[in-house]
Amino acid sequence: MTAVFAASDEMAMGAILAARDLGRRVPEDLSVVGVDGHDLGELVGLTTIAQDAYQQGFDAALLLLDMINGAPVPESLTYPTELVRRGSTAPLAPGA
């Protein structure tokens, strides 16, 4: 395994700690990417897919109220994301 794509930044930080416990170096031996853009990720140099969790939560609450009141709701919502490259990922090794 050369990379981990975690469902959250917290899980990604756990993967980094587990890799270190196993003697694996991040990013030399294992690249790690999280999702959220959590502030703690900046402290540990975590590459992340940043998203606006506050806006998503706000919109979810409004949608729930609309559903309770019988109002029509969209089938899906799409939010912008941004790849924030930090020190937990490395380029693909030649020949890999």
Regions found by a protein language model. Give the residues of each.
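Flexible loop/turn connectors
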Residues: 1-95
